[in-house]
């Protein structure tokens, strides 16, 4: 696996991890069972995606780096700070929409910056972007209901 592909795979893995961290922190604050279930499904989808990244890394004989402790702490602190201001379901959904859009943009930029990659990695990137876009659509629908 080329350096640009390792960078891309690592970034996908780390972005999925950030999504899981964010969901883990907000899910405890959600009282609406339908919205909670939606976030649980998103968490599980991120987890399965991380597993796919792990499999590709093992098959390519590379080790993926997790997010640094500082980045995890920063993400957790940002979520808690935002929740401290407003714990409403509407605010949580708005916050997750913002994070999801940031993830979509990051995926597109990183993919473009990495240039030509293997077909297997291209499929993984496309699947991750599609997954995030699906999350975005579901979050928009929930926002319209609250």
Where in the sequence are the language-model features?
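Conserved alpha-helical segments that form or flank metal/cofactor-binding pockets of metalloenzymes
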Residues: 37-70, 139-145
């Amino acid at each position: 696996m080329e350096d640009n592909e390792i960078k891309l795979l690592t970034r996908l893995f780390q972005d999925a991890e950030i999504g899981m961290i964010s969901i883990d922190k907000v899910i405890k604050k959600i009282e609406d069972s339908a919205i909670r279930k939606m976030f649980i499904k998103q968490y599980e989808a991120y987890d399965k995606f991380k597993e796919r990244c792990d499999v590709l890394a093992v098959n390519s004989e590379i080790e993926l780096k997790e997010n640094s402790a500082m980045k995890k702490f920063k993400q957790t602190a940002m979520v808690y700070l935002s929740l401290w201001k407003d714990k409403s379901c509407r605010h949580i959904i708005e916050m997750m929409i913002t994070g999801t859009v940031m993830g979509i943009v990051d995926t597109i930029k990183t993919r473009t910056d990495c240039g030509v990659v293997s077909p297997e990695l291209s499929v993984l990137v496309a699947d991750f972007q599609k997954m995030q876009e699906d999350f975005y659509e579901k979050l928009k629908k929930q926002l319209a209901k609250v």
